[in-house]
C-alpha cells in the first residue's frame, strides 16, 4: 500500500494493500478502494451531498457504500460522491465529478471535467469525452461514445415547478452502441436507439430510432448508419 502522508482516510474506509493514494486525497467512511486502484492528488471519494436549503431536491447526507473497482484510475481533482459504484479498469479524468447514486461500469472513460449527476447509470466500455454534462436520472448503456461539450437535461419545466418530483426529472436513455457528436444537446426523456448516431451540434427534441443518423436544429433523420 502506498498512501501519501497528506492523504486523509477516515475510519470505516477500506483501502486495498496495493492501492496508491497520492497527496491530499480525502477518502470518507463507507468507501471501498479495491486492488490496483490509483487515486491522484486532491481527489475526494465518498463525500456526501449538501444542499444548503437552496434546492428543491432533498438529499441524503449520510455516508453510504462507495466503491472504486479494481485497477481503476481516479485522476487529479476528481470528486466521487457517496453511494456510487465505479467499475473495474475505469478512468476518471482530471476534475471529473460523479454525484451520489451513480453506477459506472467496467472499462469506461469519464474524461476531464465531465460531470455525471445523481442516480445515473452508465454501462461497460462507454466513453464520455471532455467537458460533457450527463444529467441526473439518465441511463447510458454499453459501448456508447459521447463526444466533447455534449449537454443533456432532465427537466422540461426548467425549475419552475413548486417542488421536486423525481418521476418528472428524467434524463435521456442512450442505448447500446450509440454515438453522440461534439456539442450536441439532448433534451429530457429522449431515447436514442441502438447504434444510432447524433451529429455534432444537433439539438435532439425527439426520440432517435436505432441505426439512424440525425443532424440539425432540431435534429432530423438524414440516413441509416453505415
Features from the language model and the residues they span:
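Structural signal for interior beta-strand "rungs" in well-ordered beta-sheet cores
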Residues: 2-52, 56-215, 220-221
